[in-house]
Amino acid sequence: MRLLVFADLHLDAPFAWADPEVAQARRRALRRCLVRICELAVAQRCDALCCAGDLFEQDRFTPDTAAFLRDTFAQIHPLPVYLAPGNHDWLGPASLYRQVEWTDNVHLFESSALEPVTLADGFTLWGAAHRAPANTPGFLDGFAVDRGGVHIALFHGSEQGELVFQESGKVPHAPFRAAQIPAAGLHHALVGHFHTPRDAAAHTYPGNPEPLAFGETGERAAVVVDVDGSGAVARRRHRVAGTEVHDVTVGLDGVAHASQVRDRVAAALAGLTGTARVTLAGEIAPDVDLDVADLHEVAPHLDAVVTRLGRVNVAYDLDVLASEPTVRGQFVRDVRDAADLTDEQRRRVMVTGLRALAGRRDLEVR
């Protein structure tokens, strides 16, 4: 039995970090990714295509997206498509899933409890749906298979032992423990929700197949899962992302003027494709007018550049400044003598005050 599994595509995602034009381009990229996934399922001669939830954003989908999904899955007919709604594409009365007249190769899991579908003689797929955007209990709680053969689960949930591997702030929807999978009589679980890919002994998180945010790790892929008659699985990840998202840190030590900042950022981004987030860090001269807005056009070959300040320090000679018979000198002396400030607070007050006294606009201190 050969299955292709993906999850967390998030069609119609807002891409709040991008301007409207770039965000729309990213949403088009998500659609192209789904087409590649379907083509891969056909090319790999899979017995079924499985989506483990968050196919789209329920609170943002458009009628055009509904038509796109129907036609995309219809084009691979008669290849079966199994959909297990997650917390972002949860199954409710107003769901996109309810508004589409799907072709007969599409099977939508609708129950909040795992329900069986026979894939072939001796092979059963168990799937379930989130029926609300939050507070969905674990699908494996109290569950046990009730028949012989090989059993695979498809759902959207949070393996509690995986939390240390996943991105911070991820809400544990439909929580479960890996040990519950074999204890329930399942041979393997295909799971969505966590965006970091993970191939564990009893379960697979494919991760989001197309980049959604900065800081993502692991290859953006769909997973071909071969299941033999004993229930053993073999997995192969296939890259399906059409674009790349990069996190780049640019060191600013020794920078004396703004043009050098631009040059360093341009050099760091040369040869990259897609979208990049640049984090600026290091020690710069006091007179450098650092404005991240000036860097957005530094790499026109990229789809977008998002720039942020990391730990940027200003190389003030405080001993020289403290010796001045000026307002600035008195300020430096007062901050140095302030006993109620921690070293970090003193640094921030010093830099902010000196910038303000110089008439600078960039008062934010990291």
Predicted segments, located by residue:
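A generic secondary-structure signal
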Residues: 36-44, 72, 142, 264-268
